[in-house]
Amino acid sequence: MADESKFEQVKGNVKETAGNVMDNKDLEQEGKEDKASGKAKEVTENAKDKVNDFIDKLKK
């Protein structure tokens, strides 16, 4: 899953840069949204991992 969120961030960065270079504000905005979505997924995944690690420690 972490790879998916990183890929989404990279894809967003490419779109944002392309939109900026081509002066395409819609593409640039779409890229920003993809980056933000990917980052949010990454943060959620990290939080889930930490909770699961904590639960595993409690079970021991």
UniProtKB/Swiss-Prot annotation:
Q: Where is this region: Disordered?
A: 1-60
User: What Gene3D superfamilies does the record point to?
Assistant: YjbJ
Biased composition, class Basic and acidic residues, residue ranges: 23-60
**Which superkingdom is the protein from?**
Bacteria
What family does the database annotate? Belongs to the UPF0337 (CsbD) family.
Q: What is the recorded name of this protein?
A: UPF0337 protein SSP1897
